Amino acid sequence: MRLNFAYPATGLQKSFEVDEEKKLRLFFEKRMSQEVAIDALGDEWKGYVVRIGGGNDKQGFPMKQGILTNGRVRLLLKKGQSCYRERKNGERKRKSVRGCIVDANMSALSLVIVKKGDGEIEGLTDSVLPRKLGPKRASKIRKLFNLTKHDDVTKYVITHDKTFPDGVTKTIAPKIQRLITPARIARKKYLLRQKRNQKIKMRDDAAAYHKLLAKYSKEEHDAKIARRRSSASHHSESEVKKTSKK
């Protein structure tokens, strides 16, 4: 079985091949996210504690958190769930995944070191891989360097040099996100002013509409009364003519 170790404190990763089942028994019947002491792997691992992050079986099917079995199941998966990436919007698909319990049929395990032991592991804990990429968000840069709102964040961006295939070396600086600039303030004021003007226009249009509607209703009411009066006068005239003939 291949054991893929990761040590977040140094940023390094390393794989080890372990063929002796006796050493691997300490992982059997353990679940994902469970912490395991790995003293049985050898003297160099004495005192180390790892967390099981996942793994694959011998056919390549991945482990899925929350499936309490050591075998394979077929689940209807959708966007946002692990072990599946949708190809179309709203697409769901039934896929085979392995449960979250480790057994002898696993071919690879992902392990994260949560507690360092007594000795150093070459290529994993003996050196530190420097981070080339720093934070991009303005608030996180301020938090990292303990800056105030009035300090210039652009002077504290973490940059790194990158050599391109043509041999040219350039300094790469990330674009700062959510940075408050005069242009952004002006744009926000413009949008607020536009929104306020739109509300005033809607209010004026609604008032004009209600005024026009009231005028139209009054005209309709007056016309209806006029028709009623005209009909009544015509009816009274016909009655007078009938009585005069008699």
Swiss-Prot record:
Q: Where is the composition biased (Basic and acidic residues)?
A: 234-246
What Gene3D superfamilies would the database entry show? 1.20.5.2650
Keyword Phosphoprotein, does the record have it?
yes
Annotated keywords: Cytoplasm, Nucleus, Phosphoprotein, Ribonucleoprotein, Ribosomal protein
Gene Ontology cellular-component terms for this entry are: cytoplasm; nucleolus; ribosome; small-subunit processome
Pfam families assigned to the protein according to its UniProt record, in alphabetical order? Ribosomal_S6e
Cell location:
Cytoplasm; Nucleus, Nucleolus
Family to which this protein belongs:
Belongs to the eukaryotic ribosomal protein eS6 family.
Oligomer status and interactors: Component of the small ribosomal subunit. Part of the small subunit (SSU) processome, composed of more than 70 proteins and the RNA chaperone small nucleolar RNA (snoRNA) U3.
> What does the protein in this record do?
Component of the 40S small ribosomal subunit. Plays an important role in controlling cell growth and proliferation through the selective translation of particular classes of mRNA. Part of the small subunit (SSU) processome, first precursor of the small eukaryotic ribosomal subunit.
Task: State the protein's name.
Answer: Small ribosomal subunit protein eS6
Q: Which organism is it from?
A: Caenorhabditis elegans
